[in-house]
């Protein structure tokens, strides 16, 4: 046939049996990839420290998606929340991976069957004897079935009526676990951070899909609409399907990057905006302030800060810090976090508490500046020592740690003080193991960043695909050069070109 690579799909254009076959094969490939990727991730995943080395630090991509749907246990005897388990049941991580691989194999066989037995009676128009598909009817069937699946997920799986529920956590990502969720039918259901909205929206959308599917099964489209939207052309289906996919991809890119109840920070890592807004820092200071109000010492108040909360308040966990072409997990960048050193409090020789100005997201380097409670610069690490007025040595800055591994330890040696001031620019200070994975010290993005980049990129590509195929199907007659109003019979093999009076005609 000699088709160029970008036109090979025309071989299934008027062949419904093999069109079905290649779609089943595509499903086999997707499902097979998902199952295989899950097994690979499980082979390299270390579940030993869910606080300082969670799945998103290790670059896991499919494990978080399984976990948010209620899978938490492994046949290896571990649980994602830490600790060991004795009876994980069939729906463990490995069980889900295996189910995808088995399903992939069945789809593979079905694809081969439909490729061989392509000329089925069901695809044949009894009036003409030619292969054809009743596309509006197929649309109704698919809408109905997807509505049933959507409703079932929201009404049974998410609510725990028949299923585990979904991953639910607090606003600071500390207490996450899988639990049933009640639908939120009020205005709060439209808050993207309210899990109840997931249940109610799936129930509502599923109900709408079921009703719309039944409508399209029982009502035929008007002839003018059928012709105007080219409902008899398979390329119309391709165009509108691409539209649905790119729209969904844009939506999920947004919910992933900006955060939502569907993308918990315990599974995908924090968002960049939580660093930009000092979200975790404010909560930490609020908790310390509450402790001090209860007559706790600074050391006691800081010691009660969960290590998990302190770890979120570290710039290395910001997904916007990784470069687009820096491959690998976060652990391959700044290393595996081993422990929290504690919160450093800097003071000058007059006893004023100083705060290190934190590095903004898009800076690779940033001057070390220490300000007092009023925002007045009191100390810095100067670029030119000859002109310095606020150097650590001149101001006499000291540092003392509260909470963490260095609790109660203080330093007055300028070199050490400057070292910790530099590290305090990056948020809370952690001991990081860079030897185990030969980490290079350059920040990486989390799966949150990869997912967003991938889906936004493909959504843009698919948007152009929608425009392309939509234009092709709507203006097919124009592109082919056939007059749409032509009713005279034209000689076979010679098409009437628009405005061409020389085309041979024959009287019927």
UniProtKB/Swiss-Prot annotation:
It comes from the Eukaryota. Pfam families: PSII. One of its GO terms (cellular component) is photosystem II. The chain crosses the membrane at residues 21-36, 101-115, 140-156, 203-218, 237-252, 457-472. InterPro entries: PS_antenna-like (IPR000932), PS_II_antenna-like_sf (IPR036001), PSII_PsbB (IPR017486). It is a multi-pass membrane protein. GO terms for molecular function: chlorophyll binding; electron transporter, transferring electrons within the cyclic electron transport pathway of photosynthesis activity. HAMAP family: PSII_PsbB_CP47. PANTHER family: PHOTOSYSTEM II CP43 REACTION CENTER PROTEIN, PHOTOSYSTEM II CP47 REACTION CENTER PROTEIN. This is Photosystem II CP47 reaction center protein. It comes from Platanus occidentalis.
